[in-house]
């Protein structure tokens, strides 16, 4: 199994096992106006890098809400024909405040607040629950739940950054691959 197979397997698993189970607000160009009518969508999954906004629109996928799949590092153990991969998942949500649809018919059309952080942590709780229950991801990865799951708000230089009305959190965990590619044949066959 290759590193790219691991990244693709995790992204596919997130798209089928996590994202369909939550709907979050989609950013709009008409933010915080009385006529504001927000949309809900399932998060999208992006591998390694978030696409530029125009490219995401062309393929009809939102960047936010979303999950960005990063490979943090890997470790091969050739004598055991094994490979470990450490992943970071960056969750992104957008929520500028309370909309009438959220609060009921008698509510104001829009009331700005900073409670959108609840959305990113509810998203994280769903993801953690799914990972705890997953033994295998596709036929490629085994979740190493015994090593635990590390999560935190997104930070830069050790400080939590305020990107209101966007909220971010990250999760790191490890997976094992069934077998690393045999090195002496791999280059001849695949490269």
Which residues are covered by each model-predicted region?
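Short, well-structured alpha-helical interface segments that form or flank functional binding sites
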Residues: 5, 64, 84, 118, ...
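C-terminal tail/extension regions appended to the core domain(s) of diverse proteins
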Residues: 4, 11, 164-191
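Small/polar-rich, solvent-exposed N-terminal microdomains that initiate assembly or binding
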Residues: 1-80, 186-191
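Acidic-leaning, charged glycine-interspersed low-complexity segments
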Residues: 114-178
């Amino acid at each position: 199994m290759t590193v790219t197979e691991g990244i693709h397997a995790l992204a596919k698993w997130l798209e089928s096992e996590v994202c369909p189970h939550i709907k979050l607000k989609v950013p709009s160009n008409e933010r915080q106006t009385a006529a504001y009518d927000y949309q809900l969508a399932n998060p999208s999954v992006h591998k390694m890098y978030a696409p530029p906004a125009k490219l995401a629109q062309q393929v009809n996928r939102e960047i936010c809400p979303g999950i960005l799949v990063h490979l943090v590092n890997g470790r091969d153990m050739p004598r055991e024909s094994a490979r470990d991969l450490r992943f970071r998942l960056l969750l992104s949500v957008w929520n500028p405040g309370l909309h009438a649809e959220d609060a009921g018919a008698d509510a104001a059309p829009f009331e700005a607040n900073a409670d959108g952080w609840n959305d990113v942590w509810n998203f994280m709780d769903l993801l953690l629950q799914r990972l705890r229950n997953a033994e295998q991801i596709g036929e490629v990865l085994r979740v190493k739940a015994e090593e635990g799951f590390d999560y935190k708000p997104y930070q830069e230089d050790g400080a939590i950054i305020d990107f209101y009305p966007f909220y971010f959190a990250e999760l790191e965990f490890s997976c094992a691959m069934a077998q690393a590619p045999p090195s002496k044949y791999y280059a001849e066959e695949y490269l």
